[in-house]
């Protein structure tokens, strides 16, 4: 396995670790509605950071975006909005299925759809079937799916042992939302594929290869922001017991603390895709769609490890922890299989 591929896998791991940790600051926010908290974090992660970093990277910010016609930008934006819909459905999936089953089904579907639909759309799926490296990477995808399933099972055992139940368990509604979440969340993978002309244009301007994907985030995350912020603002305006005015009428120190914690959560959320771009840049071009598989499987891996570090499994018993450990090992094996496949 080449150093470039190894570093690509490593950066995807770092990005996934940030994704697994990003909600920790949000949990410390007090006396704010979820909608206000999510909006403040989202403004940082989907608007302020992408625009600021792109402005720092590009020699002429407006000229760069002005060179693309609508036929290039619109698919990137719409796939970003598609991914934003997946974000909203993610929370509802947890509500009706519980954390473990919800995460397992949603992540499993988005891993498969986001990874395999891209080569199918591009007409490159035969590379996966008819080449040794392609078959090995395809094997890695399915091994990762098995790993996700094992971690999901560990979570179910933990929830059963600790008496944790879904907020409003509804299997039919939850499964429908999980499938929708999995499909729509793959929009980020499709957006990255659609944004290749933007990456190439950034490279032509002399932007470092590690950073060429970052300017496209202005458009991708703009689509996600439209959906997420629109959803939050509508709820804040329509739902009787929600009020942004009340949220900002708290004691000044608490408001400042909530803003800083929400902003930190937004920063950590953004960093997952900052390092995703670094990892994506190191993956061989013919296998660039494998970035999504690496990110999502590492997200599950890191989520389990973070849970252990935060002692969320302390009272779960030995069996759930053993099953979790097995799932994490399987995901690590899957990443190595994919890496070897890309190198062959």
Swiss-Prot record:
Entry keywords, A to Z: Cell inner membrane, Cell membrane, Membrane, Sugar transport, Symport, Transmembrane, Transmembrane helix, Transport
Membrane-topology descriptor: Multi-pass membrane protein
One Pfam short name: RhaT
Keyword Cell membrane: yes
One Gene Ontology cellular component: plasma membrane
Parts of the chain that traverse the membrane: 4-24, 38-58, 68-88, 101-121, 137-157, 175-195, 214-234, 259-279, 290-310, 321-341
Localization (cell): Cell inner membrane
An annotated Gene Ontology molecular function: rhamnose transmembrane transporter activity
Catalytic activity: L-rhamnopyranose(in) + H(+)(in) = L-rhamnopyranose(out) + H(+)(out)
Origin: domain of life: Bacteria
Protein family membership: Belongs to the L-rhamnose transporter (TC 2.A.7.6) family.
Function, as annotated: Uptake of L-rhamnose across the cytoplasmic membrane with the concomitant transport of protons into the cell (symport system).
NCBIfam families cross-referenced by the UniProt entry: PRK13499.1-1, PRK13499.1-3, RhaT
Protein name: L-rhamnose-proton symporter
């Amino acid at each position: 396995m080449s150093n470039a591929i190894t570093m690509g896998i490593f950066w995807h791991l770092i990005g996934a670790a940030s994704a697994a940790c990003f909600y920790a600051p949000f949990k410390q926010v007090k006396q704010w509605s979820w909608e206000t908290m999510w909006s403040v974090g989202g403004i940082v992660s989907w608007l302020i950071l992408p625009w600021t970093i792109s402005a720092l990277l590009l020699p002429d910010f407006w000229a760069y975006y002005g060179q693309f016609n609508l036929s290039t930008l619109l698919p990137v934006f719409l796939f970003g909005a598609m991914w934003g819909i997946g974000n909203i459905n993610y929370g509802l999936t947890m509500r009706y299925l519980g954390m473990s089953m919800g995460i397992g089904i949603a992540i499993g579907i988005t891993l498969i759809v986001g990874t395999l639909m891209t080569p199918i759309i591009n007409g490159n799926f035969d590379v996966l079937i008819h080449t040794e490296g392609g078959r090995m990477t395809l094997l890695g995808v399915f091994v990762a799916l098995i790993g996700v399933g094992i971690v999901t099972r560990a979570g179910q055992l933990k929830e059963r042992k600790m008496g944790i139940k879904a907020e409003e368990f509804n299997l039919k509604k939850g499964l429908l939302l999980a499938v929708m979440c999995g499909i729509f969340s793959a929009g980020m993978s499709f957006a990255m594929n659609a944004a290749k002309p933007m990456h190439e244009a950034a490279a032509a301007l002399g932007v470092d290869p590690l950073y060429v994907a970052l300017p496209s985030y202005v458009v991708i995350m703009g689509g996600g922001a439209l959906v997420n912020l629109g959803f939050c603002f509508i709820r804040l305006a329509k739902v009787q017991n929600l009020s942004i005015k009340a949220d900002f009428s708290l004691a000044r120190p608490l408001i400042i603390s909530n803003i800083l914690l929400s902003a930190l959560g937004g920063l950590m959320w953004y960093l997952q895709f900052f390092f995703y771009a670094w990892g994506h840049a190191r993956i061989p071009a013919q296998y660039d769609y494998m970035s999504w598989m690496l990110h999502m499987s590492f997200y599950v891996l890191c989520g389990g490890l973070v849970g252990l570090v935060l002692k969320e499994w302390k009272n779960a018993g030995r069996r759930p922890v053993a099953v979790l450990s097995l799932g994490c090992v399987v995901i690590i094996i899957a990443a190595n299989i994919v890496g070897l496949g890309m190198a062959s």
